[in-house]
C-alpha cells in the first residue's frame, strides 16, 4: 500500500504563547513561538528513538524530499537536505536555525539562542543559554562571562542574515519587472 512508498512530513508553521514572557499568540522570537515539531517518516527506516536536537529550518523540507527521492534539487534551492540526520540522528546539517519576525532576527543553536533587534538602527541583543534556561528568562547578552559566545553568535547571525536576504540567480526578476511597468 501507500505506507510502503510514501514519505510523510508533519510540521507546524509556528509555536504559540499562552502568556509566557507576557505574550499571547505567536508574535515573538522566543522558543515558544519558533520551535515547531518536524516529523519525517520514510518507508523502510527504523525510527525507534530517532529524535534529533539538531537545528533545522522549514526551508530544509524541500531539499530533503528531493534527496530522499533521488531527484537533484534546482540550483536556486537554499535549504539543506536533512537526509544525513534521518540516517544518523547524531548528524548535523547546520549549526544554527535562523528566524525573522518584524525588526528582529534570531538564531538557535543546540545550546544557545541569540536575537538581534534593529531599533531604528540601534542593535540590541538577547542571549539565552538553554542548558541552564530553557524558558529564556535570563538575558545573558551583557554578561561578560558570555562575551565570547555572544560575539561569535553575532558574527554568525550577521552572516546568516546576509545569506537569507540574497536572491538566488534568476529568481524574482519576473516580479520586479512587473512592478516596474
Where are these regions (language model features)?
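C-terminal cap/loop subdomain of S1 sulfatases and analogous C-terminal strand-loop tails that border
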Residues: 14-20, 59-62, 66-130, 135, ...
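Active-site rim elements
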Residues: 25, 45-56, 68-73, 136-146
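Histidine-centered active-site microenvironments of extracellular/periplasmic hydrolases
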Residues: 2-50, 57
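A general marker of short, structured functional hotspots
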Residues: 12, 26, 121-124, 142
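Residue-level recognition of short, well-ordered coil/turn positions
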Residues: 1-2, 90-91, 145
